[in-house]
Curated annotation (Swiss-Prot), chain A:
PANTHER family: EXOCYST COMPLEX COMPONENT 6B (PTHR12702:SF3), SEC15 (PTHR12702)
Protein's name according to its UniProt entry: Exocyst complex component 6B
Source organism (scientific name): Homo sapiens (Human)
A GO BP entry: intracellular protein transport
Gene: EXOC6B
Protein role: Component of the exocyst complex involved in the docking of exocytic vesicles with fusion sites on the plasma membrane.
Curated annotation (Swiss-Prot), chain B:
Residues bound to Mg(2+): T23, T41, D64
EC numbers on record: 3.6.5.2
Organism field: Homo sapiens (Human)
Residues with Phosphothreonine modification: T73
Domain notes: Switch 1, switch 2 and the interswitch regions are characteristic of Rab GTPases and mediate the interactions with Rab downstream effectors. The switch regions undergo conformational changes upon nucleotide binding which drives interaction with specific sets of effector proteins, with most effectors only binding to GTP-bound Rab.
Keywords: Acetylation, Cell projection, Cytoplasm, Cytoplasmic vesicle, Cytoskeleton, Endoplasmic reticulum, Endosome, Golgi apparatus, GTP-binding, Hydrolase, Isopeptide bond, Lipoprotein, Lysosome, Membrane, Neurodegeneration, Nucleotide-binding, Phosphoprotein, Prenylation, Protein transport, Transport, Ubl conjugation
GO CC annotation: adherens junction; cilium; cytoplasmic vesicle membrane; cytoskeleton; cytosol; endoplasmic reticulum membrane; endoplasmic reticulum tubular network; endosome
Effect of T73D: Phosphomimetic mutant. Reduces interaction with GDI1
Annotated gene: RAB10
Protein's UniProt keywords contain Zinc: no
Function: The small GTPases Rab are key regulators of intracellular membrane trafficking, from the formation of transport vesicles to their fusion with membranes. Rabs cycle between an inactive GDP-bound form and an active GTP-bound form that is able to recruit to membranes different set of downstream effectors directly responsible for vesicle formation, movement, tethering and fusion. That Rab is mainly involved in the biosynthetic transport of proteins from the Golgi to the plasma membrane. Regulates, for instance, SLC2A4/GLUT4 glucose transporter-enriched vesicles delivery to the plasma membrane.
Protein name per UniProt: Ras-related protein Rab-10
A Pfam family this chain is assigned to: Ras
Organism superkingdom: Eukaryota
Length: 811, 200
């Protein structure tokens, strides 16, 4: 029973399935029927399905048949109706075809016109769209064109503003276009280009100020010079006023520059107005030589670009480099003043520019930076000046340099730079200046002394007399009364040296001007320098002349006279210094002049040289001595050489009557002493091993000639026998031997009033030995054998006694 | 015996107007020096220079005289002892040449008869300022039978030649000494042979 229910259930399911399949066959396309049919064949109900399918087919056939039967008559009527319509339709067709052919023929042009109208409408739409797009793009292009123009005309700041506008306002609206992309890509490049071009302008500017530093500095120095000249006439007020005016002008420029870069001004074409205004203005100093606008523009551009710090660093770095270049002195700067002037002009120009930048920009440079730069500059300048000024050998150049340094310092002081170190250095240069002056005057004195004729100055007229007296403070009533022609006692070098000393004092004074020294300091400095001139320079010059190899008595005598007069003139030099410094001699701590010492020393040296000179002449005569020490002949006159010698001395003292008395006396005494000493040496020298009484007698004649000279009073002022005392030693020695007065000598030796007080026993023995040798040699003469033997015994006896004296004297 | 450092002593004298260059001529010869500044000689001065001629050492004692008239008395006293005298004039100074005749008369009056003489025309380097032609100097020398040189102390022209020539002329008139004979001081004797050589 369960099996039957189950079969019935399956049959219902199958029936439902078959129904579904049949609906699918009826609704699905042929292409999809395959899977459906396969599902039928997969099952086991194929036969049943076929039955149902056949059933459904017969049903559908009956439905169709019924329908056809029902509508048969209507169908027939319709067919009849249709056949009628077909005829009518054919007529209509023919008519329409004909109409169409006519219409086609007639409306051909209209069709063409319609086509054209269609094209026009299309174009119009395109044009309208294009115009709409272009209206959006046009401002961009205009801005870009403007940008290009501004770049071309190098108005970079406006260009930068245009660029900003373009980038942030206009381009975003049309960013989808390709050319806009190109623009956007180019903007960074353009920005860089503006930076680069601005930097290039700055570099040109830096080059310009470097090139014009010299001119700028020169102008500033000249202005300072003019200001100083004015200060010497009017009050201090004009200086302050001038300075204010300068600052004011600077600020005016600054304001103008700011205005010229503002957007408002740009839009209103204000640049032209401003430029015209600039042209009309007269700007002093740096403004006339250098256009500062590039640095201002560049500063603004970099500020806008957010690179201000980069710009500041670059500017300061470059200026430091330029400072080092400016501070590098040319290697031959010391040769001319122009070398120094150019150097100073460059430095001043550099700092004038920096000062201007400081006051016309907002922080591009600051006081700390400039002060640091100035400190470096000052130390380098001072070092350079120390080095180069030490090469200067021309005092005029040193003096001009000092004036230039003062002007340099004053100029920079006006701009607020501290310059005390420069004035300190000027005091060092002053010492060097003094040294240079001393060298110069050494040359001057040498020339004066070398070119002097060492003769008294002759004057033939009152005019000439007054001229000499005007140059040198000499007063002599006796000389003044003498008739012309007459002579001053001194030679040309006296007034010349005196005047040159005064010139030296003037030169020292010149250097002290503008150094802010007190009168007492100046006076002290001048006296010290003058002392050096007198005690060192002039002294050396005089000594060099006096020690010259071929100096003659003429020159030496005149130098003695000249230095006497120069010594007396020292008090007038003191007065001269007092007059030009207005410092009284009584002032405490005033340095004194020591010139008198120089002239005394020179005079003493000249005197010594006279004595030496005379003695050398005497020596030359003595070298001509030609004694025959073995002669037996008795001469009757002095040796020829000695006669000449005495004649020379006599004529020398006769012609040098202008030699001061004491000097003449000393010279004469010195000559006589030298002559006596030399003759004694001649007699006693070892090379003379033997001599005869005859030789002694000839020698005695020569000594008598000398004594005659001494007695004759060759130089006034000697006491009766003072000069003769020079020969007393010789006289006593010769008397002793010629008179063979040994008994008296030996008996009286040691007595205070003995006749041969000045005969030294050693000397006597030496001479006696020479005579003994002579006697021995003559032993061979038979006829004198006895006498000679006796004499030899006597000589031996005396020699023995002399040795005894010598021995006892020693013990 | 003291040894002499020379064989013979010749005494020479320089005379002429002031400023012709006598002292400069002497300095050039004795010290080979020249001083551009003119310093007037006062009175008398001398230099000694040893030269060697014909194997003999000869000391030349050369006296330099002041040319100024005020020293005339002193300078003429030296004429007597001179063995050779140089008369100096300045070729740029006609007056100094004209005065040569005066100086020649002084020699005749004050010097030994047999003194050897020589004429010097100094400053011949200053030809652009010459006023005395060389021919004039030669002529007056020829007339007096004496040697003539144009010299320049500044440029050192003919200086040594002049002195050595004069010394040779004096030597030629000096008696030859016998070997080992006693040395005789020539100047102390008056026996020098008096023949005078002619120059042309």
């Amino acid at each position: 029973m369960e099996r039957g229910k189950m079969a019935e259930a399956e049959s219902l399911e199958t029936a439902a399935e078959h129904e579904r399949i049949l609906r699918e066959i009826e609704s699905t396309d042929t292409a999809c029927i395959g899977p459906t049919l396969r599902s039928v064949y997969d099952g086991e109900e194929h036969g049943r399905f076929m039955e149902k399918l056949e059933t459904r087919i017969r049903n559908h056939d009956r439905e169709i048949e019924k329908m056809c039967n029902f509508h048969y008559q209507g169908f027939v009527d319709s067919i009849t109706e249709l056949l009628k319509v077909r005829g009518e339709a054919q007529k209509l067709k023919n008519q329409v075809t004909d109409t169409n052919r006519k219409l086609q023929h007639e409306g051909k042009e209209l069709v063409i016109a319609m086509e054209e109208l269609k094209q026009c409408r299309l174009q119009q739409r395109n044009i309208s769209a294009t115009v709409d797009k272009l209206m959006l793009c046009l401002p961009v292009l205009e801005m870009y064109s403007k940008l290009r123009d501004q770049m071309k005309t190098k108005r970079h700041y406006p260009a930068l503003k245009t660029l900003e506008h373009l980038e942030h306002t206009y381009l975003p609206q049309v960013s989808h276009y390709r050319f806009c992309k190109v623009m956007v890509d180019n903007i960074p490049k353009l920005r860089e280009e503006i930076k680069d071009v601005s930097m290039s302008d700055l570099k040109d500017f830096l080059e310009s100020i470097r090139k014009h530093s010299d001119k700028i500095g020169e102008t500033a120095m000249k202005q300072a010079q003019q200001q100083r000249n004015l200060d010497n006439i009017v009050l201090q007020q004009p200086r302050i006023g001038s300075k204010r005016k300068s600052k004011k002008d600077a600020y005016i420029i600054f304001d103008t520059e700011i205005e010229s870069t503002s957007p408002k001004s740009e839009q209103d074409s204000g640049i032209l107005d401003v430029e015209d205004e600039e042209d009309d203005e007269e700007v002093p100093g740096a403004q006339d030589l250098v256009d500062f606008s590039p640095v201002y523009r560049c500063l603004h551009i970099y500020s806008v670009l957010g690179a201000r710090e980069t710009f500041e660093n670059y500017y300061r770095k470059q200026r430091r480099k330029q400072a080092r270049l400016v501070l590098q002195p040319p290697s031959n700067m010391h040769e001319t003043l122009d070398g120094y002037r150019k150097y100073f002009n460059q430095i001043v120009g550099f700092f004038v520019v920096e000062d201007h930048i400081l006051h016309t920009t907002q922080g591009l440079v600051n006081r700390a930076y400039i002060d640091e730069l100035w400190e470096m500059a000052l130390s380098k300048t001072i070092a350079a000046l120390r080095t180069h000024s030490s090469y200067c050998s021309d005092p005029n150049l040193v003096l001009d340099l000092k004036n230039l340094i003062v002007l340099f310092a004053d100029t920079l002081q006006v701009y607020g730079f501290p310059v005390n170190q420069l004035f300190d250095m000027l005091l060092e240069i002053r010492d060097q200046y003094s040294e240079t002056l001393l060298k110069k005057w050494a040359g001057i004195f040498r020339n004066i002394l070398d070119s002097d004729n060492y003769s008294p100055i002759p004057v033939t007229s009152e005019e000439m007399y007054k001229k000499v007296v005007g140059q040198f403070p000499f007063q002599d009533i006796e000389l003044e009364k003498q008739p012309f022609p007459k002579k001053f006692p001194f030679s040309e070098f006296v007034p010349k040296v005196y005047n040159q000393i005064k010139e030296f004092i003037y030169a020292c004074l010149k250097f002290s001007e503008d150094l802010h020294l007190s009168s007492t300091e100046v006076d002290d400095m001048i006296r010290k320098s003058t002392n050096l001139l007198l005690t060192r320079t002039l002294s050396n010059s005089l000594q060099n002349v006096i020690k010259r190899k071929n100096i003659g008595l003429t020159e030496l005598v005149q130098i003695i006279i000249n230095t006497t007069h120069l010594e007396k003139s020292c008090k007038y030099l003191e007065e001269f210094i007092t007059n030009i410094t207005n410092v009284l001699p009584e002032t405490v701590h005033t340095t004194k002049l020591y010139g008198t010492t120089t002239f005394k020393d020179a005079r003493h040296a000249a005197e010594e040289e006279i004595y030496t000179n005379l003695n050398q002449k005497i020596d030359q005569f003595l070298q001509l001595a030609d004694y025959d020490w073995m002669t037996g002949d008795l001469g009757n006159k002095a040796s020829d050489y000695l006669v000449d010698l005495i004649a020379f001395l006599r004529s020398t003292f006769a012609v040098f009557t202008h030699l001061p008395g004491k000097v003449a006396q000393t010279a004469c005494m010195s000559a006589c002493k030298h002559l006596a000493t030399s003759l004694m040496q001649l007699l006693l020298e070892a090379e003379v091993r033997q001599l005869t009484l005859g030789a002694l007698q000839q020698f005695n004649l020569d000594v008598r000639e000398c004594e005659q000279f001494a007695r004759s009073g060759p130089v006034p002022g000697f006491q009766e026998d003072t000069l003769q005392l020079a020969f007393i030693d010789l006289r006593q020695l010769l008397d002793l031997f010629i008179q063979w007065d040994w008994s008296t000598y030996l008996a009286d030796y040691g007595q205070p009033n003995c006749k041969y007080l000045r005969v030294n026993p050693v000397t006597a023995l030496t001479l006696l030995e020479k005579m003994k040798d002579t006697s021995r040699k003559n032993n061979m003469f038979a006829q004198f054998r006895k006498n000679e033997r006796d004499k030899q015994k006597l000589i031996d006896t005396v020699a023995k006694q002399l040795r005894g004296l010598i021995s006892s004297h020693h013990s | 015996m003291a040894k002499k450092t020379y064989d013979l002593l010749f005494k020479l004298l320089l005379i002429g107007d002031s400023g012709v260059g006598k002292t400069c001529v002497l300095f050039r010869f004795s010290d080979d020096a020249f001083n551009t500044t003119f310093i007037s000689t006062i009175g008398i001065d001398f230099k000694i220079k040893t030269v060697e001629l014909q194997g003999k050492k000869i000391k030349l004692q050369i006296w330099d005289t002041a040319g100024q008239e005020r020293f005339h008395t002193i300078t003429t006293s030296y004429y007597r002892g001179a063995m050779g005298i140089m008369l100096v004039y300045d070729i740029t100074n006609g007056k100094s040449f004209e005065n040569i005749s005066k100086w020649l008369r002084n020699i005749d009056e004050h010097a030994n008869e047999d003194v050897e003489r020589m004429l010097l025309g100094n400053k011949c380097d200053m030809d652009d300022k010459r006023v005395v032609p060389k021919g004039k100097g030669e002529q007056i020398a020829r007339e007096h039978g004496i040697r003539f040189f144009e010299t320049s102390a500044k440029a050192n022209i003919n200086i040594e030649k002049a002195f050595l020539t004069l010394a040779e002329d004096i030597l030629r008139k000096t008696p030859v000494k016998e070997p080992n004979s006693e040395n005789v001081d020539i100047s102390s004797g008056g026996g020098v042979t008096g023949w005078k050589s002619k120059c042309c």
